Structures are given as structure tokens and as C-alpha cells.
């Protein structure tokens, strides 16, 4: 069922909290792979199916009619994120005049339904649990941090300084190669303004940032 309101979406998400992947997959008649090595997107697909997400692999938000993006957040036994969170691909060409206010990243992060999930690899996939959902909108300070990082990274892209971009740049968000392998190439802007072949780059939220979101929800002060 496709949720028609935020309340319906949150209610559906709360109804699957506490289930294991195996229990939910059996309910939806979806086969469970032995692990995620060849099925990296399986958990996201499972939750999308369970919650009635509409976007599939399109560039819009998962629940575009509600203005909500769905993000799974693998956490360890201590409740800390295990990995960075992909937001969207960076526009490496045709990006002059793009501002934070109308950027794809801001659109994707304007309202997120976070679904924490057990991610420790020693737990068999079928036995990993789904956590309580978090419906999140950036605070003014979080938006400031995201905007600052986005502008700094986009400046490097627009000015043809792709070779200067490293994963260390950015307080809460970073740019990293995004592709199934290093043979995936796209077009970008070179040092002299020429069009070059380069690796696709994606915006990723740092683990410290998503940990802050979890802590705020749990009202636990970070150590």
C-alpha cells in the first residue's frame, strides 16, 4: 500500500520495526540472499517494498508525493553508523549557476525517513533486525553545515579542480567516487575548462553526522 500521508508512512514504518529481515521478506514473499556481497541494494529494496515507495531508481525522492526520502542506516551493536550514507551523484558538467537552494542534495535531504538496521556482519542476514524509524528534517545548523560543504565541493568541480577533491574535504559531507568499479567513467570539467573523462562522484554523509541524527532522536548526548 502506498502511504498517502506522513502519518501513514510513519505508522507503516513503525509496524515493521522489531522484525527481522527474514520475517519481513517471508511476509512479502521475497527471497533472502545468503549475504549482501552481490546484493548490496537488497535491504533498501525490501524496505521500499514494505513501505510502498514509488520512485524506484529514479532521481526523485522515494516518496515524492510526500516529499520524503527513505534511507537505511546500518548500525553496530552500540548504535553507531557503520558506513557513510550516499545522497546523490554530483553534477560534474552543466552545473554553472546551480545553487544550494535548488540542488539535488538539498532536495533529497529536505525530509528523510531513516530506518536504522542491524548491520554487523557476524549476524546472519535473515536474523538482522529493523530499528525504529526516524522522520528527520535538517536543523538550521545542520542545513548550514551541509550547504557549506556542498558549496566548497561544488566550487572545486565547477573550477575544474577534480584532482584536488579528496574524501577528507567537508565537515559533514564528502565527495567520493561512485561506481560499480573504476572502469565507470563520466564527463567532467578539466583544469583548462575542457571536457574530460573522469570517475562519477557521489555526495556522502559522514558517519559522525548520521550518528548525531540518531543521538538527537534517542536524546542521548554523544560521548
From Swiss-Prot:
Localisation: Cytoplasm
Read off the InterPro entries from this record. DNA_mismatch_repair_MutH (IPR004230), DNA_rep_MutH/RE_typeII_Sau3AI (IPR011337), DNA_rep_MutH/T2_RE_sf (IPR037057), Restrct_endonuc-II-like (IPR011335)
What CDD domains does UniProt report for this protein, alphabetically? MutH-like
Q: Which GO terms describe its biological process?
A: DNA modification; mismatch repair
SMART domains linked to this entry: MutH (SM00927)
What is the superkingdom listed in this entry's lineage? Bacteria
Entry GO MF terms: DNA binding; endonuclease activity
Q: What Gene Ontology cellular-component terms does the record carry?
A: cytoplasm
Print the keywords alphabetically: Cytoplasm, DNA damage, DNA repair, Endonuclease, Hydrolase, Nuclease
Q: Which HAMAP family match?
A: MutH
Family label: Belongs to the MutH family.
Describe its function: Sequence-specific endonuclease that cleaves unmethylated GATC sequences. It is involved in DNA mismatch repair.
The identity of this protein, by name, is DNA mismatch repair protein MutH
Q: Which organism is it from?
A: Haemophilus influenzae (strain PittGG)
